[in-house]
Amino acid sequence: AYQHIDYDEQVTIKEAQFRQVIKRIGGLDIDEDEVEVVSSSNKWHYRNRISLNARRTETDEVIYGFIARDNRSLVRIKECLLAHAPVNELVPDLNKTKWGHKNRQRDRPLRATIRHASSNKETVAFYGKAPVGLPWRREVYNDREFVMPAGSFSQVNREVAEALQRMCAEIISSLEACTFVIDAFCGSGFLSMGLRDVKVVGLEIDAKGVEAANFNAQDQGLTTHKYVAGDVNKLLRQRLGKLAPETTLILDPPRAGVGPGTIKAISKRSPKWILYVSCDPGTLGRDLKEILPLGYKHKKLAMLDMFPQTSHFESLILLELDNA
């Protein structure tokens, strides 16, 4: 945690960490002035979601909190300084909710997730995986409403997430020759929903996420957007093989990175541009080490502080195929 460090210094440290990791693992030497930095104006209480571990005490009470440094003990909390106020308001009352009563009856209580939606301001709690019957969340980003499956991934810092979506749209709109975008690991289509005037195909293994993405596209009048469910690497090999070179490939994988399957697909038919968004500079560096030798050069880099008071951050790099 970085809570003991002045916030401006936190951002400086993270930007330096980004450059150092990309150089050490990815072999890409980056000057300090090359990295665009996006800070968070909300330094505390920015998270719209938290997950709390559960533990049954000797008095048969179920308590919620975070795992301590010893990786065994549970530290009971009344509030989280990084969470939205509506999220914190529900923490003391977890055992009073409908799911809380059910959780208390389990031999081993499940961890609790509390989410606050920006659209209808509703705060909900569930235990373990999101129940099948739980309604889709409605979130507002950049003045547009999105639906997302209740248990799906979404960024926890709305302000910086909006900045990330705008940045991706601005980058792709600046690529005048680009007419087609593949949004790999697209989830509910968050990043590519900011795109206009280009054709978009999104690829995602989660069928519920794809259902939400297609709904969002239709709801926002994006008739040139289509989202497909299936194995991303297999779909990527099929799609890249049919497309003109003037294609931008958005990569927004989980923390584990894209892996060899995606790298192999890119090596078979390299798109003109790759816009890689990452929450782990280590796996980004690992993947860059494989992608850069395919003929790519970096054109833009950014570090977005999605997670103030922690060592984590979001990063972005635009690569362009060098045909010289």
Where in this protein do the model-derived segments appear?
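Accessory RNA-recognition modules of RNA-modification enzymes
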Residues: A1-L251, A256-T262
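Active-site donor-binding loop signature of nucleotide-sugar glycosyltransferases
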Residues: A68, M303, L321
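Core SAM-dependent methyltransferase catalytic element
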Residues: T310-A324
